[in-house]
UniProtKB/Swiss-Prot annotation:
S-adenosyl-L-methionine binds at G115, V135, G136, D137, Y138, I139, L140. It is an enzyme of class 2 (transferase). Keywords: Cytoplasm, Methyltransferase, S-adenosyl-L-methionine, Transferase, tRNA processing. GO terms for cellular component: cytosol. This is tRNA (guanine-N(1)-)-methyltransferase. Disulfide bonds: none annotated. Its EC number is 2.1.1.228. It is found in: Cytoplasm. GO terms for biological process: tRNA N1-guanine methylation.
Length: 234
């Protein structure tokens, strides 16, 4: 089994592994299912102040991360993580989805470039064939939180991370799974009645055929109500 090797470029190295040091991802890290190393972009900064950004040509608000600084940091990352694919979390990128995650994992060597300020110089993206990826239509302060989000998704897809790998087939967005790319059905556990609200009787019937049909019907209804665009692919 090949290990997922991740290199993260950031001006805030203390943010990692963050949440990835806990639960499934943390256990997988301990079990060497994935590994990571951090490169502090400021180590390649200019002047005694280790500057990594500058004013934008053409005006505009905000500062841009310099290509010379990022280029040196990326070269260092590539020397540690050969043949790696570089991803840059950005609101301009393709939207990250479960399908996108599976495509990413076809390469077990990944580099994440965490931008800050107004963004990075476009020449860096062109020079290193960087793929921009978005975690949604909103703006964050930097690329670290999107990187943590993306990695959490990727790691749980790796063999050996989940005790029961079949769990993946009954989750939302899994096109080859129980809900065929739709949203997961409602979930219930003990007690049978809580504050006057009862578990649907069909789930207590023991009739697996009826239960499976109910789960699929619930999934379709919830998907149609909340994410109707997902039904176009079903």
């Amino acid at each position: 089994m090949s290990i997922l090797h991740v290199t993260i470029l950031t001006v805030f190295p203390e943010m990692f592994p963050g949440t990835l040091g806990y639960s499934l991802a943390g256990q997988a890290l301990h079990n060497n299912i994935w590994s990571y190393n951090i490169i502090n972009i400021r180590d390649f900064g200019l002047t005694k102040h280790k500057n990594v950004d500058d004013k934008a040509y053409g005006g505009g608000d905000g500062l841009i991360m310099r290509p010379d600084v990022l280029g040196n940091a990326i070269e260092n990352a590539l020397s540690l993580n050969h043949n790696a694919k570089i991803y840059y979390p950005s609101p301009r990128g393709c939207v990250f989805t479960q399908s996108f995650a599976k495509e990413m994992l076809k390469n077990k060597n990944l580099i994440f470039l965490c931008g800050r300020y107004e963004g990075i110089d476009e020449r860096v993206i062109a020079e290193y064939n960087v793929t921009e990826v978005s975690v949604g239509d909103y703006i964050l302060s930097g690329g670290e939180i999107p990187t943590l989000t993306i990695l959490d998704c990727l790691i749980r897809l790796l063999p050996g991370v989940l005790i029961n790998q079949n769990t993946l087939s009954s989750e939302s967005f899994e096109k080859d799974g129980e809900f065929q790319g739709g949203l997961e059905c409602d979930l219930y556990t003990r007690p049978k009645i809580w504050r006057g609200r009862a578990v649907p009787s069909i789930l207590l019937s023991g009739n697996h055929r009826l239960i499976n049909n109910w789960r699929k019907e619930q999934s379709h209804m919830i998907t149609k109500l909340r994410r109707p665009e997902l039904l176009k692919d079903l």
